[in-house]
Swiss-Prot record:
The lineage of its organism: Eukaryota, Metazoa, Chordata, Craniata, Vertebrata. This is Deoxyribonuclease-1. The active site is at residues 99, 155. The record marks 34 as: Involved in actin-binding. Pfam families: Exo_endo_phos (PF03372). It comes from the Eukaryota. Residues 1-21 form the signal peptide. GO terms for molecular function: actin binding; deoxyribonuclease I activity; DNA binding. It comes from Oryctolagus cuniculus (Rabbit).
Length: 281
């Protein structure tokens, strides 16, 4: 009897732990738009990957009228309506080339409380900081240790990666000032490796040198689906509640090629990046 009771309690504890977890990812889906969504094979794998997550930040969204985004949400909600919702930025970029930041999320797990664009200066004057300024989103997460947190997205311009990653420190301070919020996740394709950020340049990046920020994806990680071995994509967390909520060893790239047994050609057709993911308890 005692053995059965202990087993039942352990099972309940496991269920509660799973129920109270939140899986978050940042995924640069190369040139995500109508062409990619018109390919049934690529679409099926993209949907399969995104269904792993409660919140997913998608970058490199080339979709002027949100047509591809609409098709993606239709696929994500195919089995049950309103399984996923989305928040999309306006097209961002200094010249004719523009991208959106796209968040897809499960409304049964989190809700969007607010969002805003970080003001990084005068774009027409050429004095702005970011090629694609962060569109910051504030989430409520009632089932995790941290009940509210913000996500700051960044897909940096490779040639400006050092300056843009460093400027995320200023974005964090701005989020604190605007919302009085310490718990912030900064993530995306930072281009934080190779010749874009060299080992000697890390000391000039405040987001790296300030101990308030915890980098979850190490420099040794490979976040690319190509033959390169680079840690371009990162997740950084700040704030005591958010840092405490991170499940140990849960932050990593998700190698979908290995997980699904894909050829190099098919994997790279999906994207040249792997998602980077983390679980909150």
């Amino acid at each position: 009897m005692r053995s059965e009771m202990l087993t039942a309690l352990l099972t309940l504890a496991v269920l509660l732990q799973v129920a109270g977890s939140l899986k978050i990812a940042a995924f640069n889906i190369r040139s995500f738009g109508e062409t990619k969504m018109s390919n049934a094979t690529l679409t099926s794998y993209i949907v399969r990957i995104l269904q792993r997550y409660d919140i997913a930040l998608i970058q490199e969204v080339r979709d002027s009228h949100l047509t591809a985004v609409g098709k993606l949400l239709d696929k994500l909600n195919e089995k049950a309506a309103d399984t996923y919702r989305f928040v999309a930025s306006e097209p961002l970029g200094r010249r004719t080339y523009k991208e959106r930041y796209l968040f897809v999320y499960r409304p049964d797990q989190v809700s969007v409380l607010d969002s805003y664009y970080y003001d990084d200066g005068c774009e027409p004057c050429g004095t702005d900081t970011f090629s694609r300024e962060p569109a910051v989103v504030r989430f409520s997460s009632p089932s995790t240790k941290v009940r509210e947190f913000a996500i700051v997205p960044l897909h940096s311009a490779p040639e400006d990666a050092v300056a843009e990653i460093d400027a995320l420190y200023d974005v964090y301070l701005d989020v604190q000032k605007k919302w009085g919020l310490q718990d912030v996740m900064l993530m995306g394709d930072f281009n934080a490796d190779y010749s874009y950020v060299t080992s000697s340049q890390w000391s000039s990046i405040r987001l790296r040198t300030n101990p308030a920020f915890k980098w979850l994806i190490p420099d040794t990680a490979d976040t690319t689906a190509t033959s390169t071995n680079c840690a371009y994509d990162r997740i950084v967390v700040a704030g005591p509640l958010l840092q405490d909520a991170v499940v140990p060893n849960s932050a990593a790239p998700f190698n979908f090629q290995a997980a699904y047994g894909l050829s190099n050609q098919l994997a790279q057709a999906i994207s040249d990046h792997y998602p980077v993911e983390v679980t909150l308890a």
